[in-house]
Amino acid sequence: MIKTITSLRKTLVLPLHLHIRTLQTFAKYNAQAASALREERKKPLYQNGDDVYADLDWDNLGFGLNPADYMYVMKCSKDGEFTQGELSPYGNIQLSPSAGVLNYGQAIYEGTKAYRKENGKLLLFRPDHNAIRMKLGAERMLMPSPSVDQFVNAVKQTALANKRWVPPAGKGTLYIRPLLMGSGPILGLGPAPEYTFIVYASPVGNYFKEGMAALNLYVEEEYVRAAPGGAGGVKSITNYAPVLKALSRAKSRGFSDVLYLDSVKKKYLEEASSCNVFVVKGRTISTPATNGTILEGITRKSVMEIASDQGYQVVEKAVHVDEVMDADEVFCTGTAVVVAPVGTITYQEKRVEYKTGDESVCQKLRSVLVGIQTGLIEDNKGWVTDIN
């Protein structure tokens, strides 16, 4: 019996050249399968005139990751200048285990969107402001950054290369994520020796699961988002993981998001987990002043200007939590959330309801902003860039 098994094993052992041939065959079939999968992914759902769309359920996008076909990659040379970037298929990137971004969190990101007009043309909304904000953030994180022209060009190329992933008008937007990171290896604490700038994209719908319904927020008193002198005013990646615990706890209790208070007195409103906050009382709209702990949102800035144009008194100041609980309306702004109404806020077991709906200040401001972003309202401010 033992001899039989030994003999059988000998017959099953292949020569080295046959092993290699077998592995090559498997690799060939794997490559063919991957290629077939990519081609299947490229099949359009439908074609409307000259517009071809990717195979997605455009009516139920949500805010999940559906990677578009291409990403833009640009490296920083040793002299601190960024080289010519290029488009490449979306996919994984290689990083050393000792990369600065992995060990010390040296990275910042931006968020912008491409919008499709009714005629199929694509628009960007104030991408130059994202570029400027990234430069300011890079200075704070001691990183070189792309020039404004390099940044905007990268965003344009990414949007155009992924045009079929831009949702049909009224179905959503193409969320574009520029990311700047310390990709070079380093052991001791210090700036990375190399930096990589990547821009990738994903079609998205509403950020919150509530869609356009009003949000229910919880005022967080234990955890804080940022402190004076820190990096709360820039889009550092280090600002976001620390909010997950408070956010998860709030969601488990049925809330949409968390409102953070200042870290010193814990009495003044700062912002939500990923968006700015506005408080409406009569014809006055207040929002927390940017003092280094609050992100200077581009949507925030745009909404403030639209509100001023409509005759509201817009005030940037320290907003006491008691003012929030006595407000007529509260709403949030951001690239992802756009302009989102707040239905209730809970603070120290007290729950307050706010005005929402078509006649609310929030909805009026949102309608104007979205109208400009999508080309339905004439842009007389120079905010929109046609990239066709």
Curated annotation (Swiss-Prot):
Principal localization reads plastid
Q: Which residues carry this modification: N6-(pyridoxal phosphate)lysine?
A: 235
Q: What is its EC number?
A: 2.6.1.42
Indicate the residues annotated as transit peptide: 1-22
State its cofactor. pyridoxal 5'-phosphate
What is the enzyme's main class?
Answer: transferase
**Molecular function, one GO term:** L-valine-2-oxoglutarate transaminase activity
Q: Give an example GO biological process.
A: plant-type cell wall organization or biogenesis
Which reaction does this chain catalyze? L-leucine + 2-oxoglutarate = 4-methyl-2-oxopentanoate + L-glutamate; L-isoleucine + 2-oxoglutarate = (S)-3-methyl-2-oxopentanoate + L-glutamate; L-valine + 2-oxoglutarate = 3-methyl-2-oxobutanoate + L-glutamate
Q: In which pathway does it act?
A: Amino-acid biosynthesis; L-isoleucine biosynthesis; L-isoleucine from 2-oxobutanoate: step 4/4; Amino-acid biosynthesis; L-leucine biosynthesis; L-leucine from 3-methyl-2-oxobutanoate: step 4/4; Amino-acid biosynthesis; L-valine biosynthesis; L-valine from pyruvate: step 4/4
The record's SUPFAM superfamilies line, in alphabetical order, gives: D-aminoacid aminotransferase-like PLP-dependent enzymes
Subcellular location as annotated: Plastid, Chloroplast
Q: How is this protein annotated for GO cellular component? A: chloroplast
Task: Give the miscellaneous note.
Answer: Branched-chain amino acids are synthesized in chloroplasts, whereas the degradation takes place in mitochondria.
Family the entry assigns: Belongs to the class-IV pyridoxal-phosphate-dependent aminotransferase family.
Please report the name of this protein according to its UniProt entry.
Branched-chain-amino-acid aminotransferase 2, chloroplastic
From which source organism is this entry? Arabidopsis thaliana (Mouse-ear cress)
From the UniProt record, report the name of the gene that encodes this protein: BCAT2
